[in-house]
Regions:
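Conserved ABC transporter NBD signature motif
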Residues: 77-89
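A short, proline-enriched helix->beta-strand linker immediately N-terminal to the Walker B motif
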Residues: 167-171
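Short helical segment in ABC ATPase nucleotide-binding domains corresponding to the A-loop/adjacent helical element
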Residues: 110-119, 129, 133, 237
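ABC-type ATPase nucleotide-binding domains, specifically the catalytic core motifs of the NBD
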Residues: 29-31, 73, 114-127, 138-139
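Helix-to-loop junction immediately C-terminal to a conserved catalytic motif
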Residues: 69
Length: 273
């Protein structure tokens, strides 16, 4: 496969990366096949970045996220956090999924945010409770701390999941298409709330999406991936541009051009009678 990677200059690239994915090949087995999800993928995420993995289905975005989380090991290459190889899951990498059922249904909103802190014994219970309440305040859910998940809307459930993850103060927040199951209006609202939350706390996030507008809005770095197996197609700066207007629209067009260059070339190569 001909991969024409376009690499943009990274702000702060002279500093050591927080997360390094070094020529990583990932494979997994199905009943019929051994699937190569990614092939020699490499990128670096620096502290405080909003780094987006963007590509179509089959490019290994979610598989990469699982590997960063420590749920699977590369067959080639290495993934390092703060210079140390990732061998297993840890509380320094917290995940937010797109499914609404990621919350514990028998616990209240506060109980869900509090639960991983108590399991990890990060602080005394009373201190952890105040910390959990502070995170709920950041996602505007203080009034719902005693409510159970089945009483919440999809967007509210995702806010709880984000608060629960950030309450652990992870080195990297891993988000696997967290807003994909929401309606368009709620999705945009959640995107804006995530950006505001980032402005308040400057956490590091690795965000997976197949939506070009979402990538342009959320990311300040965007890694473009091609499928079957997943490979790096390019890497661009975004810095939260509006995907509709000005530089954001131009960036969206450039991303589309890079991601679908092979398809355009194939169409142009077909003789027309």
């Amino acid at each position: 496969m001909n991969v024409n990677a376009e690499i943009a200059g990274r702000p702060g690239a002279m500093t050591a990366p927080l997360l390094a994915v070094d020529n990583v090949t990932l494979q997994y087995k199905t009943e019929q096949h051994l699937v190569t999800a990614t092939y020699r993928v490499g990128f670096e995420v620096h502290e405080g970045e909003r780094f987006v993995l963007l590509g179509p289905s089959g490019c290994g975005k979610s598989t990469l996220l699982k590997a960063v989380a420590g749920f699977m090991q590369p067959v080639e290459g290495e993934i390092r956090l703060s210079g140390k190889p990732i061998r297993q899951p840890g509380s320094d990498r917290m995940m937010v999924f797109q499914e609404f059922d990621q919350l514990l249904p028998w616990k209240t909103v506060l109980g869900n945010v509090l639960f991983p802190q108590l399991v990890n014994k990060r602080m005394p219970k009373d201190q952890a409770t105040e910390h959990a309440r502070a995170m709920l305040a950041k996602v505007n859910l203080s009034r719902f701390e005693n409510v159970f998940p089945h009483m919440l809307s999809g967007g509210m459930k995702q806010r709880v999941a984000i608060a629960r993850a950030l309450a652990m103060e992870p080195a990297v927040l891993l988000m696997d298409e967290p807003f994909a199951a929401l309606d368009a209006l709620t999705r945009r609202k959640m995107q804006e709330e995530l950006l505001q939350l980032w402005e308040d706390t400057r956490f590091t996030v690795l965000f997976v999406t197949h939506s070009i507008p979402e990538a342009v809005l959320i990311g300040n770095r965007i890694l473009l991936m091609s499928p079957h197996p997943g490979q790096v197609k390019g890497e661009l700066n975004s810095d939260g541009s509006d995907p509709v207007d000005g530089t954001g629209a131009k960036l969206s067009d450039r991303i589309h051009e890079i991601l679908f260059a092979d398809r355009i070339e194939e169409q142009e190569a077909v003789p027309h009678g």
